[in-house]
Amino acid sequence: MRLSRYFLPILRENPKEAEIVSHRLMLRAGMIRQEAAGIYSWLPLGLRVLQKVAEIVRQEMNRAGAIELLMPTLQLADLWRETGRYEAYGPEMLRIKDRHEREMLYGPTNEDMITAIFRSYVRSYRELPKILYHIQWKFRDEQRPRFGVMRGREFLMKDAYSFDVDEAAARLAYNRMFVSYLRIFARMGLRVIPMRAETGPIGGDQSHEFIILAETGESAVYCDAGVLNLPIPDETIDYDGDLSPIVKQWTSLYAATEDVHDAERFALETTEGQRIETRGIEVGQVFFFGDKYSKPMNANIAGPDGVERPFQGGSYGVGVSRLVGALIEANHDEAGIIWPASVAPFKVGIANLKVGDAATDAACEKLLAALEKAGVDVLYDDSADRPGAKFAKLDLIGLPYQAIVGPKGLAEGKIEIKTRASGERVELSLDEAIERLIAS
């Protein structure tokens, strides 16, 4: 992609309204534009990251055996009345009426709707287990939206829902999603800690929030430092096997959000040098809620004995748009963003230091063509900006590699490759640079 044909509205100054690093850098890097309090347009650079984050989530959900569908953003109020949640949810729910005066709402979550879908089609335990998921925009009318996409009113979520014949089977589904979450976040280069948490308005008797430790986090968290060194399951994980040892390993050490934190237990179960008391960013949460929705909605299935019973269920959310902000909070320096390669909007940024010079232009064109042919995402800065501005721009938007091409280096048959994360610079021939960037 040539920058001259791209839309990248870089801001030169730090936006005054941005309170945290991720919000400031997303605005400066031309990733988002605020349209109203807590509501953003995703501009091309930001959308590329959002799509890559969503694709990793999708791949790991599919790997774990979940099945994708798509539910609407608008829901009927009557559906929520069946479970008693319409009145109980509070002012965060945006309630509307259509032209026929039917009460509707902009969905903050989808447990009620997915239960209605399930009861319409599934009748027997023989059709179970099932895990269904979707990736969809949601709306919660936060009283004080802040921190950019970290606490917006409109946001993109992945929600999965499990359906099982009994509690034992439902707990297995919980473990399956728990393990898949470890993989999702690890693929993005994030160290995330599952912590015991309140179930809140979703309900149920078991929940874990997946937390990134960060001083800019919204809530206090407490954990044993040992959780930072636990192994992540690799791509060979067998989701049909026994996952309980992995879950037990990750939940045996103390880790809790402030809502369920027990100071006495924390002191007993950890040593002084191992205690971490800090703040955290929630990027996902899993719930086991049993028959909380199936029972009031009469979503019953016939068991092996022929007797009908409510299905046992769970709910599993990942904040896709929030993850973009969390990734920046975890990966930045004074110059800008440092994207992990798996979610970077482009892998390589090419800086042409003398646009109009025949040799420099030709080298850049060869580099661009070779990388794009190999399937590498490239942003080619072919603008007339001075070199310093180009370097600052590439550092700000955080692409993993920068290919710096100018007459001085080319006179010696070299171009420079800079690795954004380490700052390492190496001079290579054009062909060597192409080979290295494709292989990286």
UniProtKB/Swiss-Prot annotation:
One GO CC term, this protein: cytosol
Keyword Aminoacyl-tRNA synthetase applies: yes
A molecular-function term among this protein's GO annotations: ATP binding
The reaction(s) this protein catalyses: tRNA(Pro) + L-proline + ATP = L-prolyl-tRNA(Pro) + AMP + diphosphate
Gene3D superfamilies for this protein: Anticodon-binding domain (3.40.50.800), Bira Bifunctional Protein, Domain 2 (3.30.930.10)
Chief location bin: cytoplasm
GO biological process: prolyl-tRNA aminoacylation
Alphabetical list of Pfam families matching this protein: HGTP_anticodon, tRNA-synt_2b
Location relative to the cell: Cytoplasm
EC number, UniProt record: 6.1.1.15
Keywords recorded for this protein, A-Z: Aminoacyl-tRNA synthetase, ATP-binding, Cytoplasm, Ligase, Nucleotide-binding, Protein biosynthesis
Function, in words: Catalyzes the attachment of proline to tRNA(Pro) in a two-step reaction: proline is first activated by ATP to form Pro-AMP and then transferred to the acceptor end of tRNA(Pro).
Quaternary structure annotation from Swiss-Prot or TrEMBL: Homodimer.
Family label: Belongs to the class-II aminoacyl-tRNA synthetase family. ProS type 2 subfamily.
Protein name: Proline--tRNA ligase
UniProt organism field: Methylocella silvestris (strain DSM 15510 / CIP 108128 / LMG 27833 / NCIMB 13906 / BL2)
